[in-house]
Amino acid sequence: MRNVTLILDDGSRFSGKSFGYEKPVAGEVVFNTAMTGYPESLTDPSYAGQLMTLTYPLVGNYGVPPFTIEPNGLATFMESEKIHAEAIIVSDYSYEYSHWNAVESLGEWLKREQVPGITGIDTRELTKILREHGVMMGKIVFDNPIDNGQLTIDNYAAVNYVDRVSCKEIISYLPDGTSRSFPLTMPIAQLNCQLSTVNCQLKKVLLVDCGVKTNIIRCLLKRNVEVIRVPWDYDFNGLEFDGLFISNGPGDPDTCDAAVQNIRKAM
């Protein structure tokens, strides 16, 4: 394991060991208090661009489930199709894992996804700093200066992370586990016609995808509705729907002016 250091914007330094992919990264440092669910948290699009600190001391003891896709295109055990967090920071990483559904260790998964992981960090002290001063920018650097290059800490709020994680097409999900995709260039009138051909009895919920988790879509489908998922900046005015759902997501909402304008017109 290589030595690695987390450096915060205020100059605070935390030394640890690497157990994931070895590359320097920078991002907004945040903490997560969940006792379990690191596969779901890491694949949550809301964590895009962030260095995730887990406050629960022991992490990795139940490994990582397989990545499988359901017939409707949703990930079975994850919140999206890939890891979105820039890195994971833990106090004590367990190299041994045991779970009926595990196929690999957390460290192996991180290396395959090219995401750094740090263990041996005093996450209690780090969390106290973040709690008192609020989230702040930070960077992870390795013991070899050559590896770190010209790593700089950008302004997290200046990057439109929502645009990076939002869907790139219109997707219709049905309660029966099927889905259909439509190009963004399809005229609204034609799209309305296509959407009404399957089951006109179902209520339609329009989902503005600002970084939605798969579990949110599943919860909506359990209400026996059709979910129409559109990109964050898609002008959905003219589409026929019965309910409007705006998902959460990463980054600063100020970068999502197009979504605000579309929602304002709809309201």
Where are these regions (language model features)?
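A beta-strand-loop signature enriched in Asp, Gly, Thr, and Trp
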Residues: 241-267
